[in-house]
Amino acid sequence: MTKVIHTDNAPAAIGPYVQAVDLGNMLLTSGQIPVNPKTGEVPADIVAQARQSLENVKAIVEQAGLQVANIVKTTVFVKDLNDFAAVNAEYERFFKENNHPSFPARSCVEVARLPKDVGIEIEAIAVKA
């Protein structure tokens, strides 16, 4: 049975979708853009945007009763692949700080545009151990 996951600690959906769905043994998040859920603001630089998107993913994963360590796959959408190294560095910091046993599998794709003209969006798949 599918369960909808919602938390006020991540931005509300800006379209006809939910923050995540829990399939019982697997959690699928919608893409998280770097909107601070408390202020509605978007950080200016790509490193802070990457961190905010990851923190939003974390909030959703934790609302489902899981941890960052349960994330097995992410998809990262960036507006500019020239930001790849900066995003990678923050991504690595985030997963190390959150005690991920390795790193999740990942795809990274450059896209023409993202909602609210942000520089990054991240979605994740997490599994229950």
Swiss-Prot record:
Listed PROSITE patterns: UPF0076
Matches recorded under InterPro entries: RidA, RidA_CS, RutC-like_sf, YjgF/YER057c/UK114
Superkingdom, natural source: Bacteria
Entry GO terms, CC: cytosol
GO molecular function: deaminase activity
Residue ranges of the TM segments: none
Record family assignment: Belongs to the RutC family.
UniProt-recorded name of the protein: RutC family protein PM1466
Species assigned in the record: Pasteurella multocida (strain Pm70)
